[in-house]
Swiss-Prot record, chain B:
Ranges occupied by PFTA repeats: 47-81, 89-123, 125-159, 160-193, 199-233
Stated family: Belongs to the protein prenyltransferase subunit alpha family.
Record keyword Repeat present: yes
Protein name: Protein farnesyltransferase/geranylgeranyltransferase type-1 subunit alpha
Subunit structure: Farnesyltransferase and geranyl-geranyltransferase share a common alpha subunit (RAM2). Protein farnesyltransferase is a heterodimer of alpha subunit RAM2 and beta subunit RAM1. Protein geranyl-geranyltransferase type-1 is a heterodimer of alpha subunit RAM2 and beta subunit CDC43.
Coiled-coil intervals: none
Keywords for the protein's UniProt record, in alphabetical order: Cytoplasm, Magnesium, Prenyltransferase, Repeat, Transferase
GO molecular function terms listed in the Swiss-Prot or TrEMBL record: CAAX-protein geranylgeranyltransferase activity; protein farnesyltransferase activity; protein geranylgeranyltransferase activity
Record's subcellular location: Cytoplasm
Cofactor(s) recorded in Swiss-Prot or TrEMBL: Mg(2+)
Purpose: Essential subunit of both the farnesyltransferase and the geranylgeranyltransferase complex. Contributes to the transfer of a farnesyl or geranylgeranyl moiety from farnesyl or geranylgeranyl diphosphate to a cysteine at the fourth position from the C-terminus of several proteins having the C-terminal sequence Cys-aliphatic-aliphatic-X. If X is Ser, Ala, Met, Cys, or Gln, then the protein is farnesylated, if X is Leu or Phe, then the protein is geranylgeranylated. The alpha subunit wraps partly around the beta subunit forming part of the active site.
Main location: cytoplasm
InterPro entries associated with the record: Prenyl_trans_a
Amino acid sequence: MCQATNGPSRVVTKKHRKFFERHLQLLPSSHQGHDVNRMAIIFYSISGLSIFDVNVSAKYGDHLGWMRKHYIKTVLDDTENTAISGFVGSLVMNIPHATTINLPNTLFALLSMIMLRDYEYFETILDKRSLARFVSKCQRPDRGSFVSCLDYKTNCGSSVDSDDLRFCYIAVAILYICGCRSKEDFDEYIDTEKLLGYIMSQQCYNGAFGAHNEPHSGYTSCALSTLALLSSLEKLSDKFKEDTITWLLHRQVSSHGCMKFESELNASYDQSDDGGFQGRENKFADTCYAFWCLNSLHLLTKDWKMLCQTELVTNYLLDRTQKTLTGGFSKNDEEDADLYHSCLGSAALALIEGKFNGELCIPQEIFNDFSKRCCF
Amino acid sequence: MEEYDYSDVKPLPIETDLQDELCRIMYTEDYKRLMGLARALISLNELSPRALQLTAEIIDVAPAFYTIWNYRFNIVRHMMSESEDTVLYLNKELDWLDEVTLNNPKNYQIWSYRQSLLKLHPSPSFKRELPILKLMIDDDSKNYHVWSYRKWCCLFFSDFQHELAYASDLIETDIYNNSAWTHRMFYWVNAKDVISKVELADELQFIMDKIQLVPQNISPWTYLRGFQELFHDRLQWDSKVVDFATTFIGDVLSLPIGSPEDLPEIESSYALEFLAYHWGADPCTRDNAVKAYSLLAIKYDPIRKNLWHHKINNLN
Ligand SMILES: [Zn+2]
């Protein structure tokens, strides 16, 4: 990817592949704290490898049996004996008589299985109805938003968990993978109107989305991706869309014009961030926000590449946060590469190349193949 | 810390060295022991003091383990009903949570757990939450979770009386703190039925003073626009604000648009953008808007030149 027409590529592809591969191997005990969300580690690694054209289904196909073990189905103790199902992040969380599946691990696992091309799993093993029922139980009836897990005993939406746009996005993405496309499809499991109401309530005054009027690129991407998956982007007013495009483009850090006045005064400004994206006003640029901002822009306007001059953000990523020695990408120029920023930095570059499905965060070609093979 | 006896608990050991495992983690012996016990107690749903103690130890090694927060909450709810003094019991739990919060600034479960405790508390108090909020903001003045929690408290306690002063203090420390600026907007949006014209005029003066101090700062300009739109039906101050913004752009509007080198420096691109937005709304001043956007594209904010051209297209 990003192969210049002449001269060698600036992308250290081989190093990146090695970086992602390493995360699928033996990890030191310092990763214990992430054990509960191990599906996230697997997803970021496999997505990163897929972006760099590694045939992950051939390379990791042997691990499908182990992956499938993370899918847990529970028959509820109600009159209809209804079942719910989903994934745990790690088998450590598989505890008898306790419901521990959660939405993020479920989405990460499903996307990983799609990338591993385990189509048999989707066609014959995965129980989409009970999975969708689990999603449905995570919706808060009062607000329309989603929490990420159920009470381990009562199987009602957890009253200890938070609800926000991330979990709304994850819930809708899972249903989309289960085959929901039209509003009627979604309505079979969730209160779509109420969810849309919640999303609209997270619009901020000057464009973009966030909690209580503090706009945030990550939440903005979640909100817009959710609306896109629900085919509901047209619910946004033209003014709000225009304000959001303007807000997103303002997240691109610049060292030119009047912006350079900030270098002496603003402790969260660095001229060398030029071209990169920040998550909020007056923050340093950060690799992951290149993806969140570009994905948001790409959902709002077909002119997104021209508007943000993608060569500038490409330069920021390749020259500033790509780690040419170790592979991977770091959050900024100071830290070491980490898995999350490596995946999202690579994803941003793939999105620019038109090879990436930003709504689901996997390569477009993989999603196309999945849709062709598994039409439910 | 009290020592509890778990010797009668039959642990549910975690399986290790599975075939075809991905991301195999080299667990420490301590982690294996704690998880083995926790899995057993969760499975039995034992709601006891020793279970509570164990959840604290698990949270110490794996704060992202969502079920453990849920489990702890169920233990607290159960033991609270058995304790003689519910308030004291829940306050002790909040004290414990304060310590955990300080050690896990990026964890978000903590904040929703805290909300659940306050909802359970017979006499919750905003004042009790202020010290931990202050410590967390002192540590990271833009921590999104902490700000969201503060806003949740304002709504939960219907108490906004300290918010403007609080935001002012933080803006005093760092005039670029966008979280503090957006907190002001949160204040007005939620308090707007009970505010006077004097308060609004004071707020406008506050914004203008801060812009005067540092004109090239996106936060107060964005806030100014939002504030103006929020109260557009309440106060007529367009000309005052426009005159104010104009003082930051020199005489560039009257100069011919030549090459960037021929144009003088101005104090604030945001002032120019603010004016362009304002002028663009009125057909009589549309030409000014086009010129302002052109100037932004050529010299004052060139990275967004295609955005400015797009704005010009929208005007035509
Ligand atoms: Zn980041």
